[in-house]
Amino acid sequence: MNRPAIAKFRGAGIGGLSLAFTLGALPLLADTPAVTVTAPRELEQLRNEVDTFVSSAITRPYGDDSLLRWDHPVCPLVAGMPRGAGEFALLRLSQIARSAHVPLGSETCRPNLFVIVAQNPERFLRLWWRHDPRLFNTRFGVAPVKRFIEYSRPVRVWYNAAVTGGDNGVVLGNLLATSTDPGGGLVDYPVFAGPSILGSRITRTVVQSISSAIVVVDLAQVSKLNIGQLVDYIGLVGLAEINLDKDVGEAPTILKVFSATSIPPPPEMTVWDKALLQSLYTTPQRNRMQLSQMETATLKLLAAR
């Protein structure tokens, strides 16, 4: 088994919990051509579409908080998939992360990106939470956690984050928590940020960094996807805080695989998705204009193709 350096695969369980879920209903990834932007577009039209896509797809932070991303090595663990599908998922997630310049952990890293396929996600999450009461971190009690557990969607995501120095140094705050469910929002712990030479009107003293993420797939709701579509979708929502309830406009994106439209969804992550991720990880997180810089960077990447 040729595993990527960061890869960890578990087909049996997580934290002592048994998993008996399979992905037998998912077809394998077919050989499909890459999705590219081929229709001629005027630059201004492309800019408008890119701005809509980036500003809608990326979850806007509260107040003066930075955008959320992985600033420390990500280490995925996959559970609930057959071995072949699990190995494919880990390899593909590694490829997505590398191409977007996401830091990756070593072969012996401790898992912090949990990808779980479950037949009954709500029941599994309740059992896992009971087994590990510190699994979710939130300042305002258990309400955000319950929303995350109880709200049904094909793929749900929970991010635990830490506040770090603007140079990605020492952790300054306890864990934060945010989920993609309606009303989940960012729930933060109070953090003291004293005077710093890093802070200014255009730069932040501290930034938010994902410390762990939980991606839970409802097997019954993804049966129409092939394994490639599913893993690419997981890669995007697991590496960036995506707003799953916003309309991203006309952009061709893997985020539309669950949209109820007559237009066939992309067979894999598109160049728009790749540009979005790359722009998130190549623009300065401390800069208060990062979202605008992401729009510019994404436009340049797409226009160059």
Give, region by region, the residue ranges found by the protein language model.
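Long, folded non-catalytic interaction modules
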Residues: 47, 77-92, 101-305
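Acidic/histidine-rich, surface-exposed loop or edge segments in extracytoplasmic proteins
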Residues: 34-35, 66-81
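Bacterial N-terminal signal peptides
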Residues: 15-25
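N-terminal secretory signal peptides that target proteins for export/translocation
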Residues: 1-11
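N-terminal post-signal-peptidase region of extra-cytosolic proteins
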Residues: 53-62, 95-102, 200
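Compositionally biased P/S/T/G-rich terminal and signal peptide-adjacent segments
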Residues: 44-70
